[in-house]
From Swiss-Prot:
NCBIfam families (UniProt xref): rsmG_gidB
Catalytic function, reaction form: guanosine(527) in 16S rRNA + S-adenosyl-L-methionine = N(7)-methylguanosine(527) in 16S rRNA + S-adenosyl-L-homocysteine
Subcellular location: Cytoplasm
GO molecular function, one term: rRNA (guanine-N7-)-methyltransferase activity
Family membership noted in the UniProt record: Belongs to the methyltransferase superfamily. RNA methyltransferase RsmG family.
Pfam short name (any one): GidB
Protein task: Specifically methylates the N7 position of guanine in position 527 of 16S rRNA.
Keywords: Cytoplasm, Methyltransferase, rRNA processing, S-adenosyl-L-methionine, Transferase
Protein name, UniProt field: Ribosomal RNA small subunit methyltransferase G
A GO-annotated cellular component: cytosol
Domain of life: Bacteria
Length: 209
């Protein structure tokens, strides 16, 4: 397979992310595993390798500049590992938990962690409402997991004091924000431009009050 090095590096530059060559290689190896396992595990509807670079790698990495201050991140409904795996590669100092209730998907995620040697990643097979970690998280994220109100409802017990939600959304989620329950405040909604992706993206930062 081609590794799309130029496309990936150009995208990283546009996102203002400075990664080392070993980190870029890890991203490429992750992409190769995603392509391979997707043939039988249906991890993503996107089959074209070149589209995966923008839709999965760069889209996930667009989250990284907005995680400053966090030390423990939970990726809820991680699926094929987005955004958790690319984020963990870009931020080796960040402890990342990948949570999904689908055994096939977490089998894939464990294989990725094993093959790439990612010591800062933990894979958990569980339903989010049943998950009871020893330590809570100061950053909780998701990509296409659920509407914001449901996302917060299911994860409140996992959020550390002074933690933040950083939810990845497409178009500006006016209706979802309006339906948020009391005790949840939206601190900012950031428009994000993903290289190679002709679609709206927004990050919604929320805190518990």
């Amino acid at each position: 397979m081609t590794l799309h090095t130029a496309e990936l590096k150009q995208g990283l530059a546009q996102l203002a992310l400075e990664l080392t060559e070993p980190q870029v290689e890890l991203l490429q190896r992750y992409l190769a595993l995603l392509v391979k396992w997707n043939q039988t595990y249906n991890l993503t509807a996107i089959r074209q390798e070149e589209r995966m670079v923008s839709y999965h790698l760069l889209d996930s990495l667009s989250l990284v500049p907005h995680l400053a201050g966090g030390t423990r991140m939970l990726d809820v409904g991680s699926g094929g590992g987005m955004p958790g795996i690319p984020t963990a590669i870009a931020r080796p100092d960040l402890q990342v938990a990948l949570l999904d209730s689908n055994h096939k998907k977490t089998t894939f995620l464990r294989q990725v962690v094993l093959e790439l040697g990612l010591p800062n990643v933990q894979v958990v097979t569980d339903r989010v409402e049943a998950y009871q970690p020893e330590q809570k998280f100061d950053r909780i994220t998701s990509r296409a997991f659920s509407e914001l109100s449901e996302f917060v409802k299911l994860t409140r017990h996992l959020m550390a004091d002074d933690g933040q939600y950083v939810a990845m959304k497409g178009v500006y989620p006016y209706e979802e924000i309006a339906l948020l329950p009391q005790g949840v405040a939206v601190s900012e909604v950031l428009p994000v431009t993903v290289p190679g992706l002709d679609a709206e993206r927004h990050l919604v930062r929320m805190v518990l009050q």
